[in-house]
């Protein structure tokens, strides 16, 4: 571009005409002032310079005015209608119960355990849901026992066919839109009576919410997975068999063969011990002795003095396995056994679905967001609830409709996988509805490794070296 004999090089992008004109104007103004002061311009060249400057300023004003007019909304333009979202009801049912009197306060579960993980997942899912047309809404139901919840639901169903109330929280059927409610079950039990109660509870809820999809986020009982395999129930918490197999793989890797087992009096403790016995048989470990913890010990008064005597056996052992779901004794065993050996299970080296020191594969940002939101670490129950919500949201993102059968078909399809900060895609075992996943082997302050460990292979999926039963639905373990 030339003005007179002075060339201006097009160093400004053509898309920014206003800026280009402004820079050209400033450059010419400076040039004209300099030329006038030095007296080097003739009158004719001065007039050309002034004319060029005027043209640049005029073009700049015109472009600014056009841009301003385009930015202003038209008075006749109608406001865009707001998008309508399909609401996915998320009901978190928690059977709180009471902690035994001997459980230390620092080992008790947080009051918002599970619901905190679900809340983080809902926040993430609703961001994507704004573009796909769905939103999760969380409702919490807390009762002391399963039987009380069943009674509340049955009584409310007699008075109203469309809704039920439990603990003053309404559970409403969503049959008008056929959107499947997502029910997260937070209840621990491991004997046949309680497992049957959970199945009956699901049946009771189905009478109110016939199209619901259920997720078990706390119960690790293998019996529940076998007996409820025909229900629309998925298990995001690892089973006891998965945890026991992970510990057994670690024992084989460390060449530890002789194990002494100590277990508590709860049904969960018996279930964990039974799973470890199956793992010991599968991986050819030897259980030298098995003892049940005695409540007569007063750890606060005796200051752990009786622990070495209790852990004394007729045969030597190389490790101690503990099953203590109520946190009554296992915390007192590390570095206090008769033989100086590692403790695993409920204390020492634990097999967990999630540990707060896990930071690989993007897990660090999830840990940070959870810690910022709730000022505590994320545990395996929180992650199981997070995983349940994420699985449903992921199914919706893959194009599944929000009806029960659509979600079930997506989750149980052969090619379904889910990324969940564990380094390997998660999938679901069709015969037990258990989520395949890595198991974290960790102690109180650090992550040791993830199972399955190197060298343990499977013909189809290495994650099936952890807890995959060689049985079919309804077969006995």
Regions found by a protein language model. Name each.
Residues 7, 15, 42, 47-50, ...:
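Small/flexible residues
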Residues 14, 37, 58-59, 163, ...:
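Hydrophobic alpha-helical elements and their junctions with loops/disorder across both membrane
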Residues 6, 20, 32-35, 45, ...:
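N-terminal cationic leader/targeting segments used for protein routing and processing
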Residues 27, 44, 50-51, 224, ...:
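Disulfide-bonded cysteine motifs in exported proteins
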Residues 22, 51, 456-459:
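Intrinsic-disorder-associated interaction segments
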Residues 52-61:
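Bacterial N-terminal signal peptides
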């Amino acid at each position: 571009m030339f003005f007179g004999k002075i060339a201006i090089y097009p160093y400004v992008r053509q898309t920014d005409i206003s800026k280009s004109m402004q820079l050209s104007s400033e450059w010419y103004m400076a040039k004209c002032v300099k030329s006038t002061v030095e007296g080097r311009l003739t009158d004719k060249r001065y007039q050309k310079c002034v004319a060029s400057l005027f043209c640049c300023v005029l073009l700049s004003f015109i472009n600014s005015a056009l841009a301003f007019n385009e930015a202003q909304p038209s008075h006749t333009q109608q406001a865009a209608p707001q998008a309508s979202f399909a609401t996915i009801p998320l009901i978190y049912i928690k059977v709180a119960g009471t902690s035994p009197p001997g459980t230390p306060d620092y080992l008790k579960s947080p009051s918002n355990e599970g619901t905190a993980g679900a809340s983080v997942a809902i926040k993430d899912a609703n961001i994507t849901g704004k573009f796909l047309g769905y939103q999760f809404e969380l409702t919490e139901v807390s009762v002391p026992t399963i039987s009380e919840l069943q009674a509340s639901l049955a009584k409310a169903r007699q008075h109203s066919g469309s809704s039920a109330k439990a603990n003053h929280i309404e559970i409403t059927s969503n049959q008008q839109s056929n959107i499947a409610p997502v029910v997260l079950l937070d209840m621990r039990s491991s004997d046949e009576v309680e497992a049957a109660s959970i199945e009956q509870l699901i049946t009771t809820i189905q009478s109110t919410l016939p199209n619901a999809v259920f997720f078990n986020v706390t119960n690790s009982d293998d019996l529940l997975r076998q007996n409820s395999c025909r229900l629309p129930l998925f298990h995001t918490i690892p089973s006891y068999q998965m945890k026991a197999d992970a510990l057994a793989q670690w024992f084989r890797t460390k060449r530890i063969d002789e194990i002494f087992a100590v277990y508590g009096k709860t049904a969960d403790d018996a279930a964990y011990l039974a799973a470890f016995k199956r793992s010991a048989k599968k991986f050819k470990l030897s259980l030298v002795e098995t003892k049940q913890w005695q409540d007569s010990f007063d750890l606060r008064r005796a200051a752990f003095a009786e622990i070495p005597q209790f852990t004394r056996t007729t045969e030597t052992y190389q490790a101690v396995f503990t099953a203590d779901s109520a946190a009554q004794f296992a915390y007192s065993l590390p570095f206090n056994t008769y033989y100086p050996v590692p403790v695993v299970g409920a204390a020492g080296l634990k097999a967990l679905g999630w540990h707060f020191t896990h930071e690989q594969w993007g897990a660090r940002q999830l840990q940070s967001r959870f810690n910022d939101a709730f000022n505590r670490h994320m545990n395996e129950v929180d992650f199981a609830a997070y995983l349940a919500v994420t699985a449903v949201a992921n199914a919706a993102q893959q194009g599944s409709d929000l009806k029960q059968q659509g979600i079930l078909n997506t989750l149980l399809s052969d090619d379904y996988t889910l990324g969940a900060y564990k380094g390997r895609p998660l999938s679901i075992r069709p015969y037990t509805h258990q989520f395949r996943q890595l198991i974290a082997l960790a102690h109180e302050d650090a992550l040791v490794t993830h199972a399955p460990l190197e060298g343990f292979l499977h013909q189809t999926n290495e994650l099936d070296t952890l807890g995959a039963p060689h049985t079919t639905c309804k077969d006995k373990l």
